[in-house]
Each structure stands twice: as structure tokens, then as C-alpha cells.
Amino acid sequence: MKTLFADLRCVAAALLVLVATTLAATGADTQNGADAAARTVLITGANRGIGLELAREYAAAGWHVIGTARKPDEATDLRALGAEVVQLDVTDQASVDGLARALGDRPIDMLINNAGIQLLMWKLEDVDIDRFDRMLAVNTVGPVRVTRALLPNLRAGHRKLIVNVTSDISSIANNTSGGFYGYRESKAALNMFTKSLADELGPEGFICIVLHPGWVRTDMGGPKAPITVQESVHGILKVVDGLSSDDNGTFLTYAGERMAW
């Protein structure tokens, strides 16, 4: 009988150690943003540059990644990550509606509106209205379309996080050089949309921010940009992982700094 009790005590002790270890591991995963099994992130413009690297990092952390591309057949790198690749043109309402139908009622924990374009116009005389309109359509109206269409999915999600990728040159307070016609305006309007969104959805537990990724060495940023895609995305992940309700409606950089509107 004594031997039986001793054996039972050993089993009980082993079970306690196992439970404690499992809880500790789960806590660590959650802290690191993994808590992966039920987490889904949707990234627009995920076939290259910052969007592709974000997809790579979140997939590696165990998240289910939904990456959009205008031409999904060409998104081979994105598909190789194990991401779910979906066709999306953010300027086409029918395409956005198609995305919403494809998702159905699936919860989305985080939406990253990353798709964007920059068509350089330095002086007023150089402004081409069609190019100006194009930047507004992609950089401003596009995120509005996508966020509105996916709001039911985001409401069903756990994290309820909306990250709109902006630029430091969208800051009105810091504009001391002019230029970048169309691009500045499109991103400044995105900032205002995000601030209004934060005020509306904050009471529901949402965190809505705009985030400047830095001047990054991508097709858009060019070869002279000082920041690699990996450096930018590592910073973004750290910022996003540390967000709290106090950050709702803020303008942040990839380094975690707050910017003036």
C-alpha cells in the first residue's frame, strides 16, 4: 500500500510539472504574438516588399496569413510561405465585394492595409490629375473600401486590430519641403480616416493606428533607402505586438515613436 501511495504521489508531481510547463509555454507564445492557432491576419498588397515580408514573419510565427494581390497567379513567393492568396484590386468595388464573399463569416484578428502606390510629382505644374486621382483611389479610398467590407469579420476577431500603412510625409505639421503632390494628400487623408475609425470603433475594443514603415529599400523606396525591408518589418512587428488601447488613434513609426499629425 505504501508503495502504491508513493507511486501516486510521483504521478501527481509529474502531472503538476507538466501543467506548469504547458502554461508557461502558452504564456510565452501569447506574449510573443504567436498564440497562433486561432489568429488570422489579412495583408493587402502582400505579393512583394513590406507586405511580403510581413506575411513571411506572421506565417513563421504561426498565424494564418491571408495575402492579397492584384495578380495572384504571379504571387509565387507569397504562396510558397503557405499563405492563403486571394485576388484583390482595392480600387475595384466588385473585387472587394468578392473578397468579402470569399471570407464569409471567418474572423479576422488583424487587417493591415498595406497596398499603396507613389507616383512622383514635385511641382504644381507637373501635377497630372489622373495620376493624382489614382493615388487617392489606391492609398485612401482603397483602405476605406476594404475596411468597410471586412468590418463584420474584424468584429468577430479576437485582436480587433487595424493597421493602415502611411508615410512620414503625410504629416501636415512636419511638411517643410512641399512636393510629393498626390502622395502626401492621399496618405494624410488615410490618417484622418484612421483617426475617425479609432473614435468610432474604440469603444468596441478595436485598436486602429497609422504606421510609418520608414524609408525602406523596396521598389517604391528605391535602392538608396537606408532601411532594409527586414529591419522595417521587425520594427513593425514589435510595435504591433505591444499595442494597447492607449495607442488607439495614434500615428506611429516602425521604431515605436509617435508622430505629429
Regions found by a protein language model. Name each.
Residues 44, 108-116, 139, 164, ...:
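Rossmann-fold scaffold of SDR-type NAD(P)-dependent oxidoreductases
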Residues 203, 210-213, 222-261:
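C-terminal helical subdomain
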